[in-house]
Amino acid sequence: MMTQKTYKKIAVLIPCYNEEGGIARVLNSFPHAKAKEQGYLIEIFVIDNNSSDRTADVARALGASVLYEPVKGKGNAIRRGFASVPKEFDYVVMLDGDNTYRPEEILRLIEPIDSGFCNVVIGSRLTGRMIEGSMTLFNRFGNWMYSYLVRWCYGVNVTDVLTGYFAWKREAVERLLPHLKSNGFAIEMEMVTKMARLGEEIYSVPVTYHPRIGDTHLNPIADSTRILWMFTKNLHWKPMLRTLKKKNSFNQQ
């Protein structure tokens, strides 16, 4: 009698605003067959952040589930995605829809979590491989500076605090979601600093970073100001006691 194989399920969240040019290449690059060989099933959720192009149509045609977040802002899209992950999933992965990150590297982010080494993995561009034209020297210095400050001030060992490539144990997402308030591009800084305050075990894995397809939606001055404010504000942030108790109960399971 044959025993049916049990697979662990990975929910991939891709927040998108007008990413028609890059989303097809991203969706076609996920290693579904390799993942299945290693005991995982990948399901993709594209969060359409009120796009004016055909992002949602392209994603749906390629087999992704499409969620709709009408209020613009990356933070809004990510929170919508987090809130929509079904309980049946073991892990949650997030990456951008502009083809800057390699979906083929997803299993390298999952492995440290699956082995019990940590609850959260950050895909580090700064310790990975940057393709020419993917990041300016100014942006690279800014990312390095913020990552250094977060390590020093928050006591968490991360090497790229503003990355857009993350993996979580699903329970870590459930603990984090109630505390997220950011609407826009400060969401990565909010996630990392609050995860540090929540006591999550975070690990960095080098990833490849490519030039984006399409125009950037980041406003260098306005968004940099919001990111700095988020870093400063969360220095004094503390989670509620019941959240920490919930984390301890998960860790004991």
List PLM regions with ranges.
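Acceptor/aglycone-binding surface of glycosyltransferases and processive sugar-polymer synthases
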Residues: 70-72, 76-84, 91, 103-185, ...
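Hydrophobic targeting segments
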Residues: 8-14, 23, 30, 43-47
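Hydrophobic helical membrane-anchoring modules
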Residues: 1-8, 155, 179-253
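A conserved acidic beta->alpha catalytic loop
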Residues: 48-56
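Short, well-formed alpha-helical segments that are part of the catalytic scaffolds
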Residues: 19-35
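Donor nucleotide-sugar binding loop of glycosyltransferases
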Residues: 19-22, 51, 74, 99-102
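Short, structured coil segments at secondary-structure junctions
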Residues: 61-63, 198
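Short beta-strand-to-loop acidic/aromatic patch adjacent to the donor-nucleotide binding site
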Residues: 89-100
